[in-house]
């Protein structure tokens, strides 16, 4: 049995995790992205298993990418509907590496608390239920029956079913999410928040009050038809690089892009489409036309200024009509 500990637990990693300073690249993706994708697939899954998964990702009759929630076009590319980030995400999901009992014997909870998310993810997939007893320093394996009994006992001990919250990820598969909500409703509650509540609760409420619906109202092909795209509060080149191909369509059709960001992210400056051979060998597509480099939290002041300007325009327009 593991011994109790009074050791102080770190909350975040105390060491830098490979941060490097260097020259800012001239463009994002291109051949480097293809090379990086191949390296991750080879290392984590092997080419056969990896490309078998990639060929099904974001395809009809396939599965959604676990990396982000970027929508899929009606006409899917036979070369693949994923980006470098998506390939890395599926490589980590389908990795050959395993985190077994010996791993948890070797590494205490306090030690693992000091690891970065990256290092934890790269360790592998767990192979059986693990349990951390009160006061213990290490996770220990338990049987599936013991795990179910423990969860059931905890749920039955609640005063009411609404005292339970069944939290999940917005990137959970449809099949798993369906079974999970069925279990929660059978238990007697509809307390089923997920990560989208944390990320989009405020925007959803504001959109509901202004346009009547708490979700986006545009379609993917609207990017190719619009005159202007304002990118604010996000780094698509880092978080959802497939958006860069949509922004590329905006520019190819004469649209303009305004970027508001403290960081001049490379992906929003110029982009080489990895599925366009001539572009890979030639010049990248310049994306951002106007870059507003606000300070951190300066976006609030900027938005207030824009709203004030719009109100002034409205009053000026009304006065002219009179």
Short names for language-model regions:
Residues 2-313:
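N-terminal export/assembly segments and adjacent metallocofactor-ligating motifs
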Residues 315-322:
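Conserved small/polar residues in nucleotide/adenosyl-binding loops
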């Amino acid at each position: 049995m593991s011994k109790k500990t009074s050791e102080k637990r770190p909350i975040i990693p105390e060491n830098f995790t490979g941060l490097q300073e260097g020259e800012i690249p001239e463009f994002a993706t291109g051949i480097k992205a293809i090379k990086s994708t191949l390296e991750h697939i080879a290392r984590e899954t092997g080419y056969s298993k990896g490309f078998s998964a990639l060929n099904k990702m974001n395809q009809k009759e396939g599965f959604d990418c676990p990396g982000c929630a970027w929508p899929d076009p009606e006409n899917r590319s036979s070369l693949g509907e994923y980006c470098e980030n998506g390939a890395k995400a599926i490589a980590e999901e389908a990795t050959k590496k395993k985190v077994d009992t010996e791993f948890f014997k070797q590494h205490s909870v306090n030690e693992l608390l000091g690891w970065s998310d990256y290092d934890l993810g790269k360790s592998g997939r767990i192979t059986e239920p693990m349990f951390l007893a009160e006061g213990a320093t290490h996770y220990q394996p338990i049987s599936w029956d013991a795990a179910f009994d423990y969860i059931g006992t905890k749920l039955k001990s609640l005063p009411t079913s609404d005292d339970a919250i069944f939290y999940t990820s917005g990137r959970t598969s449809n099949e798993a999410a369906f079974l999970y909500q069925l279990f929660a409703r059978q238990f007697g509650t509809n307390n089923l928040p997920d990560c989208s509540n944390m990320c989009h609760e405020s925007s959803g409420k504001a959109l509901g009050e202004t346009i009547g619906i708490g979700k986006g109202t545009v379609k993917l092909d609207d990017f190719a038809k619009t005159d202007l795209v304002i990118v604010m509060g996000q780094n698509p080149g880092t978080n959802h690089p497939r958006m860069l191909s949509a922004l590329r369509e905006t520019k190819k059709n004469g649209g303009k892009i305004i970027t508001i960001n403290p960081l001049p992210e490379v992906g929003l400056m110029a982009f080489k489409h990895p599925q366009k051979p001539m572009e890979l060998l030639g010049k990248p597509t310049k994306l951002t036309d106007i870059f507003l480099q606000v300070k951190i939290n300066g976006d609030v002041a900027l938005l207030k200024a824009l709203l004030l300007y719009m109100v002034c325009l409205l009053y000026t327009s009304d006065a002219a009509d009179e």
